[in-house]
Amino acid sequence: PAATGIAGSYARFGLHDQFLYTVDNFMLRTWSLQNPTCPSRRDSLYVGWNIETIFPWKDRLFVGSQTGVFIFNNTNPARPVQEAVFNHATGCDPVVCDENNAYVTIHGGTNCNGTFNQLDVIDIKNLPNASLSKSYPMTKPMGLSVTNEHLFLCDDGLKIFDKSDPLNMVQLSHLKNMTTYDVIAFSDEHLMVIGDGGFYQFDVSNP
């Protein structure tokens, strides 16, 4: 199977197979890396306004904007095709996903002009009919990452949830004495967090 790169939820670029995907405020661009020293642009798609993040997952690209999540099918990695759109309340919104759900944080108090602070769980099992399953109120959620068992969330520090039942997630831990922005879970045991003080690594084998 094609390899997908690992990146944070605030990333504006992502890797899949031999292609690089980048987003700016309006566009999704596809670059061939067959010659890694000289990437060549293969495709450009207008997505919408205020595009912020991109998260590759298997044969799909999840693009976050201030008003929603755009889902692209990249079965043909050189030519992604929009498959679904999920609209949400205005706010800054990184997005990650697993096999059945996308997880989106929305936070206000920034230049995104939002007032909501929540974690949305979006059912993506039946695309293109993505639908909101549940919203969890939060303080000011930012970056997030998921593994098979856990959801890691930058919100008033770092929160760790058991997500085995996404509609009834259980908070397992809350580390408050740090300012965090994004998180990357390499496994259910190894975590990297980006915050005011730089990069932090955690052993979360016992969350």
Where does each model-flagged region fall?
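Feature marking well-ordered beta-strand scaffolds used for ligand recognition
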Residues: 1-207
